[in-house]
């Protein structure tokens, strides 16, 4: 169940990448601690958002077991995470018209903070910003953020007419709140890009289970 401060915030799981560093395929379907990365992300985010929507390209049937609506990119040619964010914003505008904002996360981040939505929402409101992005360890994570639905036409123009692909090139146009999380005992935004990262995620998950 979501709290009263986050009930109206839909969540978008970005799984539209090509996973080149892992030899292709669906990176969020890789397994750690007996469950897929995607399952870990859903466990973390579902109590904070409603509904959850998955951005992925190709046959949506491969995600049927998760019971999520799957929205593909509308911009052709694997245009990157901005295309997935636009697909999510378009879905929210059509299916949750009362929602003013949407949270986006990478679907390969199994240790997302349980206060992600609450803190990003609070920062956006307190600082009166257009966007709020997560940060840790001195790095901003541009695909993990809170996006106003009203920016979707600006984003569409940036993608289609300006050929902008880098998330930070787009967000630099707006006032952004950056919210930082500690990296101890582990970075909550750790993501698995390589086989070595998967092994590290296994180790971190085992530590978390032991300390729970």
UniProtKB/Swiss-Prot annotation:
Subcellular location(s) of the protein: Cytoplasm
UniProt GO cellular component terms: cytoplasm
UniProt-annotated binding residues for Mg(2+): 108
MF GO annotations: GTP binding; metal ion binding; molybdenum cofactor guanylyltransferase activity
Any one Pfam family match given in the protein's UniProt record, by short name: NTP_transf_3
Required cofactor(s): Mg(2+)
Substrates-to-products reaction catalysed: Mo-molybdopterin + GTP + H(+) = Mo-molybdopterin guanine dinucleotide + diphosphate
HAMAP family: MobA
Protein name: Molybdenum cofactor guanylyltransferase
Species: Bradyrhizobium sp. (strain ORS 278)
């Amino acid at each position: 169940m979501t709290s009263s401060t986050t009930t109206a915030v839909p969540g978008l799981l970005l799984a539209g990448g090509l996973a080149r560093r892992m030899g292709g395929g669906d990176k969020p379907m890789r397994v750690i601690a007996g469950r897929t990365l995607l399952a870990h992300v859903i466990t973390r985010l579902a109590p904070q958002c409603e509904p959850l929507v998955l951005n992925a390209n190709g046959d949506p049937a491969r995600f049927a077991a998760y019971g999520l609506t799957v929205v593909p990119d509308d911009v052709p040619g694997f245009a990157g995470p901005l295309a997935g964010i636009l697909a999510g914003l378009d879905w929210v505008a059509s299916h949750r018209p009362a929602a003013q904002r949407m949270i986006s996360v990478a679907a390969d981040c199994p240790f997302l903070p349980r206060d992600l939505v609450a803190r990003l929402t609070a920062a956006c409101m307190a600082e009166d910003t257009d966007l709020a992005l997560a940060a840790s360890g001195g790095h901003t994570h541009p695909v993990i953020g809170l996006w106003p639905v009203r920016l979707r036409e600006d984003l569409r123009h940036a993608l289609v007419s300006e050929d902008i692909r880098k998330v930070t090139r787009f967000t630099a146009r707006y006032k952004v709140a950056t919210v930082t999380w500690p990296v101890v005992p582990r970075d909550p935004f750790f993501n698995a890009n390589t086989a070595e990262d998967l092994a590290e995620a296994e180790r971190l998950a085992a530590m978390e289970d032991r300390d729970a």
